[in-house]
Amino acid sequence: MAKEEVLEFPGVVTELLPNAMFRVKLENEHEIIAHTAGRMRKNRIRVLAGDKVLVEMTPYDLTKGRITYRLK
């Protein structure tokens, strides 16, 4: 997948799910299921409920995403 096809949205983590998955509510009121990106796992960045995050999604499946950044 080319990098240009990625959509980025800010959101808030609402729920922690099993297997390092998170339920994220985007600013446009959609709820998706997201997992943390490999660099966040490698650097052991913790994501908790209530954290503001940046989520990458593909235009092909708008129900799943990847958390790439935890906002301050």
Curated annotation (Swiss-Prot):
It is found in: Cytoplasm. Gene3D superfamilies: Nucleic acid-binding proteins. The keyword RNA-binding applies. Residues 1-72 form the S1-like domain. Its main location: cytoplasm. InterPro entries: NA-bd_OB-fold, RNA-binding_domain_S1_IF1, S1_domain, TIF_IF1. One of its GO terms (cellular component) is cytosol. Keywords: Cytoplasm, Initiation factor, Protein biosynthesis, RNA-binding, rRNA-binding. Component of the 30S ribosomal translation pre-initiation complex which assembles on the 30S ribosome in the order IF-2 and IF-3, IF-1 and N-formylmethionyl-tRNA(fMet); mRNA recruitment can occur at any time during PIC assembly. One of the essential components for the initiation of protein synthesis. Stabilizes the binding of IF-2 and IF-3 on the 30S subunit to which N-formylmethionyl-tRNA(fMet) subsequently binds. Helps modulate mRNA selection, yielding the 30S pre-initiation complex (PIC). Upon addition of the 50S ribosomal subunit IF-1, IF-2 and IF-3 are released leaving the mature 70S translation initiation complex. Belongs to the IF-1 family. HAMAP family: IF_1. This is Translation initiation factor IF-1. It comes from Brucella canis (strain ATCC 23365 / NCTC 10854 / RM-666).
